[in-house]
């Protein structure tokens, strides 16, 4: 995977490891690890496949803090990629359903990989579950990285203005 290249070598096979390709199981493992004090980043290969984990995300992950009156937390980060919209599989966009079904989970859709890094750096310190949907086209971009990429953070809920004008685009 382009985004995780070299992490297993750097951090070891006990911290960075493969699982079976069963989205519901990946989500269950991540919830269990997070409730034991770890900070898992669960990867679902493509946005389309997130649908197979949606019930667990909605019913179990998103509600842990609420159901336990704040006594337990599950700070899982779910990482996936999508939004190229080129075919039937691997490129769809079920965003409306995801946003409405996953109340209680931060949903981040970065426009490039630098912005994705800023979200990850922020979310790794958060106590809420989060979903980061990396843009497939982001893997093709050549970006100028900030010198502080390891500490660079993007706050949630603050819009980014790319160009001043009289129109607005809401996502």
For each predicted feature, which ranges?
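Thiamine diphosphate
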Residues: 1-139, 143, 149-151
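Glycine- and Gly-Pro-enriched alpha-helical subdomains that act as flexible
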Residues: 159, 164-165
């Amino acid at each position: 995977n382009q985004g995780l290249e070299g992490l297993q070598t750097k951090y070891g096979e006990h911290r960075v490891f493969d699982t079976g390709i069963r989205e519901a199981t990946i989500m269950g493992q991540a919830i269990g690890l997070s409730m034991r004090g770890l900070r898992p980043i669960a990867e679902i290969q493509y946005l389309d496949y997130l649908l197979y984990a949606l019930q667990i995300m909605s019913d179990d992950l998103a509600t842990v803090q609420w159901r336990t009156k704040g006594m337990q937390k599950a700070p899982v980060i779910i990482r996936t990629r999508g939004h190229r919209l080129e075919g039937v599989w691997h490129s769809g966009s079920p965003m409306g359903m995801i946003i409405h079904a996953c109340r209680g989970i931060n949903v981040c859709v970065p426009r490039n990989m630098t912005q994705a890094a800023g979200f990850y750096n922020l979310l790794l310190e958060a106590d809420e579950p989060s979903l980061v949907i990396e843009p497939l086209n982001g893997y093709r971009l050549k970006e100028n990285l900030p010198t502080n990429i390891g500490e660079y953070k993007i706050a949630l809920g603050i819009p980014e203005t790319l160009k001043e004008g009289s129109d607005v685009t809401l996502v």
